[in-house]
Amino acid sequence: MKKYIILSLMTLLMSSCAEQITRIAQYPKMYEEKPLTIAVMPPINQTQHVEAKDYFYTTLYAPLCEKGYYVYSPMMTMEMFQSESAYDAEQFIEADLSQFRNVLGADAAMFTIIKSWKRNNLGGKLTAGVEYILRSTKTGETLYRREGLIKVDTSVNGGGGIFGTLVSLAATAINTAATDKVVAGRKCTVFVLSDMPEGKYGTKYGQDQKLPAGKSYVKATVK
């Protein structure tokens, strides 16, 4: 019996190892094209929260910079996008992107699709569902694509007992309501883009090919 258990465990371990895929295998185009500069496109908002587009737009700049890329500031490009009717990114997500290469000099354009945004004050959760798509402005190829359903945990522990529970519920509700949408959006972006190959200005540039890539769709809770 023990032999069967050990054999089963070994089989599970081997299958899990076999399923793990490297970043160069998951995102080969990233390593082929080696984009240096990224233009952040205005988010495509599929939720009923009209303001989600504007506040999420500002969350993308810092995480991409931290991954080692030169990113055109949304504040600088917003006026250009609006004048070129590019503020509605839906019309560009599958279209030719050469104009962004010619005008801005961007090697790639990052598209985001906000699919859900929910706030649970008593439960202490902010949930964001976002898909990230990085496309080459040169070839039009998709270089990177990943989607996440991320819960930002804003719960507060007020101690034990009935009184402590009531304090926790009240503090959690206040903390969740007060949590800035930009902060929650940034945490979502940082988590989902965690397996994105690093750019030229990253510390692991050219050295992360064999690191494990994440699943194309990820669910997680972050603090």
Region locations from a protein language model:
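Soluble periplasmic/extracytoplasmic beta-strand elements of cell-envelope proteins
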Residues: 37-42, 109-115, 129-133, 145
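Solvent-exposed loop/turn segments at secondary-structure junctions
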Residues: 45-48, 77-81, 115-120, 150-152
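C-terminal/domain-edge helix-coil "capping" segments
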Residues: 17-34, 136-223
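N-terminal segment of the mature soluble domain
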Residues: 47-109, 141, 177
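Short glycine/proline-enriched turns and hinge-like loops at secondary-structure junctions
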Residues: 51-53, 122-127
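Sec-dependent N-terminal signal peptides
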Residues: 4-14
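Mid-length scaffold segments of soluble, non-membrane domains
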Residues: 102-117, 122-125
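Post-signal peptide N-terminal segment of mature Sec-exported envelope proteins
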Residues: 26-48
